[in-house]
Amino acid sequence: MKTKFIFITGGVLSSLGKGLAAASIGALLKARGLKVTIQKLDPYINVDPGTMNPFQHGEVYVTDDGAETDLDLGHYERYLGESLSQKNNYTSGSIYNRVITKERRGDYLGGTVQVIPHVTDEIKNAILGLAEDEPDVALIEIGGTVGDIEGLPFLEAIRQLRGDLGKDHCLYVHLTLVPYLKAAGEHKTKPTQHSVKELRSIGIQPDIILCRCEKAISAELKRKIALFCDVDQDAVFSSVDVDNIYEVPLRFYEEGFDQKIAIMLRLPAKNANLESWETLIHTCSHPEGQVTIGIVGKYVDLKEAYKSLHEALIHGGVANKVKVNLRYVNSEEITEANVAEKLAGCDGILVPGGFGHRGVEGKIRSIRHAREHKIPFFGICLGMQCAVIEYARNVLGLADANSEEFNELTDNKVIYLMTEWYDFRKGAVERRDASSDKGGTLRLGAYPCVVVPGTRAWDAYGAERVDERHRHRFEFNKAYFEAMAEKGLVFSGLSPDGELVEIVELPDHPWFLGCQFHPEFKSNPMRPHPLFREFIKAAKKEAMGGKKGK
């Protein structure tokens, strides 16, 4: 097998940044001319994160093939500039589901099904499946923290793989915390020592230790960690806190991280070309201005719920050479009386996707404020649906206009449940109703959109047909198409068969656009998404116009 595998584990505590570390390593190896892929293995029992509460899990990231995945896949795609798929994310739930399906089918010939070998073999199959596309390197991030009971089958599987594939084909990287105690004025290595001890008790000896820390650790401290953790001194690296997450690949490169990996895995000795990353950081560090974007949502207390959105707005800032300041506004707190105060100073207003009726009226009030005061507005998924509801109520005069999701009894369901649509990937019509399961039953993944010439959407894309990622079960009710068009709403993007509305906009507004899809999932720092580029461009014009007091 030509593929080399790098396994990334984490210790001491969660949220150390394994996903960013894996993505940054992948970016460095790709910059060396290698073909790279990345996989995330999540220990939770849910089959996928599709029905999980955003406050617990954060964003659900959607791939082209319709997989609902961990938000770390967003980091992977943004840093690699590659499209990933379902096989790049597995959970304990999906692994156990496969095992149980095989048992019910009789594949195990009546044998007793156990964690070892059946579950661990299924995990190994998922990992080795990455080699089918023949990448030079496959990075596998093990979710959770070493010592968690849920993660033990995954750790056992990657322990076995080194024996299966050989030492030249496997590398273990352990990310750990090295806290800095200000009172003592020094870093402490004991948490790292205990974390590695826990990992070794499972049978895994890390080859490289990556130390998450506030400031770079000294050579003396690296020697100490190397001694007690039984690794080479030049295999201990710092992962220092940075102001901009896109600096991480450059920091790793300065430490020689990619070179050490190349030596240990006997990869081609080619220097990394990081010119595009250096240009990116220079642009971020030297903005020509700044804009403030108000994000009106209900998950604002956990910024991870809007992770890709946050990054896509930053990308839009890079394209326009401005710093983007994000102000998160809780939609549940917005009233008719305070909407102007809540959104004062915003150069642009964005209403993101979401589910459920909570906070919807605050979003609709925000959209009306943006429309009437000519503030650039961008609505995504539910944000587009709310824009349609607002227009129906306040322009068409349909006071009870609503979505079937929020009010099943209204006479004017301008947004209603999708009951069928054509899935071009399957070549078949998908059908749903109100009794369908919630998990995995939305319109998911990349679908084509036909863009109407002469519109803002056309100006952004410069193309007649684009593919965008979706995650929704409600849609615009075409019974209101003509009435809204007569009142000035432009339908600038439709499905190829003309049945589904994908983009709406207002031509007599500085920039007012809503889309049913999630463009944030297809934006990366090197190629900002056209709609985010144009939205920030309009916000920049608003900021330069000095109209913040409106």
UniProtKB/Swiss-Prot annotation:
This chain's source organism reads Nitratidesulfovibrio vulgaris (strain DSM 19637 / Miyazaki F)
Q: Mind telling me which NCBIfam families this protein's record contains?
A: PRK05380.1, PyrG
Q: Which family does it belong to?
A: Belongs to the CTP synthase family.
Give the reaction(s) catalysed.
UTP + L-glutamine + ATP + H2O = CTP + L-glutamate + ADP + phosphate + 2 H(+); L-glutamine + H2O = L-glutamate + NH4(+); UTP + NH4(+) + ATP = CTP + ADP + phosphate + 2 H(+)
Positions of ATP binding: 15-20, 72
Q: Which annotated residues bind L-glutamine?
A: 354, 382-385, 405, 473
Query: CDD domains from the xrefs?
Result: CTPS_N, GATase1_CTP_Synthase
Annotated positions binding Mg(2+):
72, 141
Superkingdom, taxonomy of origin: Bacteria
Q: What is its EC number?
A: 6.3.4.2
Identify the GO cellular component terms for this protein. Answer: cytosol
Q: Which Pfam family, any one of them, does this sequence belong to? A: GATase
GO BP annotations listed: 'de novo' CTP biosynthetic process; pyrimidine nucleobase biosynthetic process
The GO molecular function terms of this record are: ATP binding; CTP synthase activity; glutaminase activity; identical protein binding; metal ion binding
Biological role stated in the UniProt entry = Catalyzes the ATP-dependent amination of UTP to CTP with either L-glutamine or ammonia as the source of nitrogen. Regulates intracellular CTP levels through interactions with the four ribonucleotide triphosphates.
What HAMAP family does the record tag this protein with?
A: PyrG
Using the UniProt annotation, give all residue ranges assigned to the region (Amidoligase domain).
1-267
| Gene coding for it | pyrG
**Does the keyword Metal-binding belong to this entry?**
yes
Q: How is its activity regulated?
A: Allosterically activated by GTP, when glutamine is the substrate; GTP has no effect on the reaction when ammonia is the substrate. The allosteric effector GTP functions by stabilizing the protein conformation that binds the tetrahedral intermediate(s) formed during glutamine hydrolysis. Inhibited by the product CTP, via allosteric rather than competitive inhibition.
Q: Which residues form the active site?
A: 381, 518, 520
Q: In which pathway does it act?
A: Pyrimidine metabolism; CTP biosynthesis via de novo pathway; CTP from UDP: step 2/2
Q: What is this protein called?
A: CTP synthase
Q: Where is the Glutamine amidotransferase type-1 domain?
A: 292-545
Please tell me where CTP binds in this chain: 14, 148-150, 188-193, 224
In terms of InterPro entries, this protein maps to: Class_I_gatase-like (IPR029062), CTP_synthase (IPR004468), CTP_synthase_N (IPR017456), GATASE (IPR017926), GATase1_CTP_Synthase (IPR033828), P-loop_NTPase (IPR027417)
UniProt keywords, alphabetically: ATP-binding, Glutamine amidotransferase, Ligase, Magnesium, Metal-binding, Nucleotide-binding, Pyrimidine biosynthesis
Which of this chain's residues are annotated to bind UTP?
Answer: 14, 188-193, 224
